[in-house]
Amino acid sequence: MSEVNVINIKNPFVDQKPGTSGLRKSTLRFQEEHYLEIFIEAIFKSINNLRGSTLVVGGDGRYGNIEAIKKIIQICVAHKVGKVIIPKNGLLSTPATSHLIRKEGAIGGIILSASHNPGGIEGDFGVKLNTANGGPAAESITNQIFQCSQSLKSYKIRNVNIPDLDKLGIYSFGETSIEIIDGLKDYSDLMENIFDLDQISDFLKKDFSLIFDAMNAVTGPYAKNIFVEKMGLVDDCVMNGIPLEDFGGLHPDPNLTYASKLADLLLVKKAYSFGAACDGDGDRNMILGQGCFVNPSDSLAVITANTNCVPGYK
């Protein structure tokens, strides 16, 4: 295995100030030399006890996702992170990342997503840090990351042979192990523990129809795994279910404008009883009933009012 390389940079990138939703810039900006690496280095410098810890890394599948994960692996090896957990094909929704961080006792997770922003070479890219509690980094941490990014003169990286991310397995590089996992299993298992999927499936197979728009983003495989494989619903209950680097030209923002086909099916044609859509990384949704739009606050209120019906919340 090669030695750790210390790559020097001339000047900091003055626009690397993240919010709680991370750092979002154009894809082209993230592809500039050293831009991603310096920001990851700043994140690592802001994490206490990084060496020997567990880190989760994944993304929403937008353009540049795989390449970014490979660079992050090399930086993790240089920093002697103990274990890096990566989903197959690099696909991991934000809710699934949150669950995996807590389940594995990870120090945090790096999510490669610009959320509901468009993808592709002409679109946007993003990096956000979730901490050990599974939630987004607090402002105090993101401020520290920015301050660090402005003072860094170099970053560490180790050139290693990156395994194919489409194959499950465990690979060792010095003090670091790379574990490529089934990114769907843990989250679908969690859903089975929280909800009675059999009961919901029986209900949906009677006189209540469902359609879900994944907007060609990360939630498509989750929806097919849960709705089709586990609950036995028809395959076409999921539309735009294949993650694409540019989201198939769609803007993955689940609203009446960008999910207009779904809205037409529910609000105009009234072809289904229930419809929903999610954004790029799966942490934002839109819910529609037959002929009606459901405000996000109302959907949360409905769940809260009926927690006694949800096994995981009893």
Task: Give the residues covered by each predicted segment.
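N-terminal glycine-rich anion-binding loop in soluble enzyme alpha/beta folds
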Residues: 3-48
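Short, glycine-/Ser/Thr-/acidic-enriched flexible segments
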Residues: 23-25, 30, 62, 115-117, ...
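Phosphate/oxyanion-binding active-site loops and adjacent basic polyanion-contact surfaces
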Residues: 31-44, 64, 93, 179-190, ...
